[in-house]
Each structure stands twice: as C-alpha cells, then as structure tokens.
Amino acid sequence: MLYIDSIKQGVTTVFDHHASYGEIPGTLHTIAEESKRLGLRSCLCYEVSDRDGEEKCLQAIKENADFISECEQRKDPMLAAIFGGHALFTISDKTFDRMVEANNGRTGYHIHVSEGMNDVYDSLQNYGRRPVQRLQDHGILGPKTILGHCIHVNTAEMEIIKETGTMVVNNPESNMGNAIGICPVLQLYKRGILLGMGTDAYTNDMLESLKVALCSQRSQNCLPNVGWCEVTDMLFKNNAKIGEKYFPDTLGVLKPGAAADIIVMDYKPFTPFSDENIDGHMIFGMTGRQCQTTIAAGKTLMLDRQLVGIDEEAENAHILEAAKKLWGELNHRTY
C-alpha cells in the first residue's frame, strides 16, 4: 500500500526503515520484490533493537547483512541497502558493535536519534554520553549515515554531525503528532549539514510534509519570515542529494543523463506562475493528490491517475483482507 500510495502522490524514491519482529528473515527481500514489481526506487533496512530479546536482535542484524549482500550481487540501480537501527535507548553498546561488525563498512546506517528526551536521558544515565557521541564512539556516523529526527541534539552534537558529514532527515508531522518537539532545522541548516525531509510513515504526500515543515519552523521560532529557503531546499534539492548517496543515477533534475523521474500535476494557477515563484505555488496551491502522472526512471507508473500494469482494486482488496486477518489475530475477534 505504501508503494501504491506513493506512486499516486508523485513519489519515485523511498527510503524505508522496516520492522516486523514476528517475521524477520527474508522480509527485506520480500519488500524489494514488491518495489521492483511496482517500479519504484527503494533503499531498505531492518530496524535492529534489543527490545525483543537477543535472538530477535541477532536475526535483525543478519537480515540487514544478508540484504546488503543481496543488493551487492544484484547491482540493480533501483534497489539499495542501508543498515537499520532503532532508537539508541533500545540498542546496547554490544549490539552496536555487532552491527558494525556485520556491516563491515559496506553501507551507512539509518537510525532514530534523539527523537524524544528519553533517548537523551537513557544515553546519559547508562553510558555517560549523549546519543550522537555514542554513535561517534561506535563508528556509526559518516557521509552515508542517515539520522532520523535529531530533535534534542545540542550544539556539540550538531558539530559532530557536521564534521562527520552525516545526514539528518526531519519528519515534521510525525514529531508534532507524537508531541515530542520540533527539529532545530534552522540551526542544522546553518551549519551546512545535509538535511532532508521525511515522513516517518505519517504520510506519503511530500508536499504535505513541506507545508507542515514550514509552519512548524515558524511556530517554533516565533518568526513568520523564516524557514522558506530551508524547507524547499530540503525537499527539492537535499532529498535528491541523499538519494544519490545510494543510487547511481543523478536524481531530482531534468537534464540529459539524469534519471527520468517526472510527475505531472493537475494544477490551474490563479496568479502568474513561473520558475521564480514555483515554490510558493507548490506550498500554497498543490498537494500530492493532484499528481496526474508519475514516471520513475523512464517507466510510466501512473498515467492520467490510472496505475499502469497494476490492478488497484485487486491490490486494495488483498490489503484489506490482510489487515482484517492481522487485526483479528491481535484482538481475538472477527472483522
């Protein structure tokens, strides 16, 4: 469903941080096959955590390592792997060492960092270090590592992130929905940190995230004239730069040799529209649901709002039945 909804809202590239501790082995391969079938570009990882016990933790580490090996062998330009980790308060030093050993320098890491203050308190109380410092101690940081959230990072941690070339992804709707704070986007951006925009699965509409990111930064800083350049750069420039760390094609631009990722929006402007004010039209006038056609790597995935080569009704029926089955098993009732 994630992939179908992404196509319908003009998304061509997905970085997914997966967890399903009831079924670990082979899950990333299964997701990769669906991504391939539907035609999107995907960078996948499994969420390593100690919270379900050592056996599950070791399985999660192996799932990441196995999928990295699979991607190395497949050499598919539409598929990539990154090593996943949950929040630091569920990962011990021993587990970090195991992750680094299993990865063996092949990829970066995709991990939740300082999403809530409990992550900071846990690191200080149990390890005597703040979260970003712990990651640095274990060799997790670097130009191919993505830190999700980074709401409660201090200035010293920001400098470490900058010095190591580590990437940060802001997830504004998720953070506001969980009432855990607002990412210090302006401070991170000012330091030259590669800062992208994500969703944390809250939505598949990146234009929705764009609007919320702008409003949240202005509200947090009590200034009505900040954030415009930062949030538009994050979505339209930096996300492509992050994608290029893991995929071989040039992304996010229309020029010879670049990936042919193109969307057509059903939008009628009521004020003059040009390259000088397109950001304003996208923030205030457009939503992902206005996407009419989606093309990824030159392949048309949706044309005139009709998915190409996909029976959407059949897919939706299958997903609904799977959801009913899952809910039934969890709640011991029939839906």
Predicted regions and their residues:
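Glycine-enriched alpha-helix->loop->beta-strand junction motifs that scaffold or abut catalytic
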Residues: 39-41, 102-108, 140-143, 160-169, ...
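Metal-coordinating catalytic core of metallo-dependent amide/deamination hydrolases
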Residues: 18-151
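Active-site microenvironment of metallo-dependent hydrolases
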Residues: 235-335
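Divalent metal-coordination and catalytic microenvironments
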Residues: 10, 35, 83, 112, ...
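His/Asp/Glu-enriched, well-ordered alpha-helical/loop segment
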Residues: 137-140, 144, 184-269, 283-287
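Hydrophobic alpha-helical hairpins/lids featuring a short glycine-rich hinge
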Residues: 1-22
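Catalytic core of soluble alpha/beta enzymes
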Residues: 115-139, 143-166, 174-186, 203-209
